[in-house]
Amino acid sequence: MTMTKTQVLDLLKEHRNERGIEHWKKRGVKDSKLKSFGIGLTQLRKLAKQIGRDHKLALQLWASDYYDAKVLGLLIDEPKKVTREQAERQVEHLQGGYLAHVFSSCDATLAKTPFAFELATEWMNSKDPVRRRCGYGLLYELSKKKVKGMDDDYLLERITFIRDQIHEEEMWVCEAMNTALMGIGKRNQVLNEAAIAAAKAIGPVDIDYGEDNSCEPLDVLKHLTSPHVKKKFKST
């Protein structure tokens, strides 16, 4: 049965997490009216599966002033009903990039749209850092799939660009580029070798996640040289 926005908000209230709310108050977006029920992404994914795909409800939740509701809106949207115009509107309201990860990466609905590759290419070359971040987030998701136009030559050029430009970028774009490099390098043997060479040339990528956060920057080289990845290529 289709749920209403009110029912979803009631569901979120039932799952509110006081510890998460305190964390939000410390880490939330400055100068924003956005509120939070303090619910983690893992729990929100479970709720999204419970609710099911619903484009109309997704747009209603996106219009909410609760972070958790906006995330659910992104998770339950229907890829075939999302338009370029909608994506361009939403990317303008990611709360300074706070919602960028769920919007463009992290198994994002946007990466499942028919225009995802075209959008990723356009956004990676944008003058807007939030769009660039999202473009690389999409590239990471797309690197897991077969996509028309995204051949090895295209990805080798992107590896070179990441290698040469990553340390010139803003911090969160840097993080997205680093993640995309890892995704590309797991695609096949040729791209793996190129991505490893790039990762060695790049060296450490510093990301400031804050003093009260245990997150550490992604070690791309470690991932790309792991026994699991090596075994994957030996079997192909």
Over which residues does each language-model region extend?
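Alpha-helical scaffold domains
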Residues: M1-T236
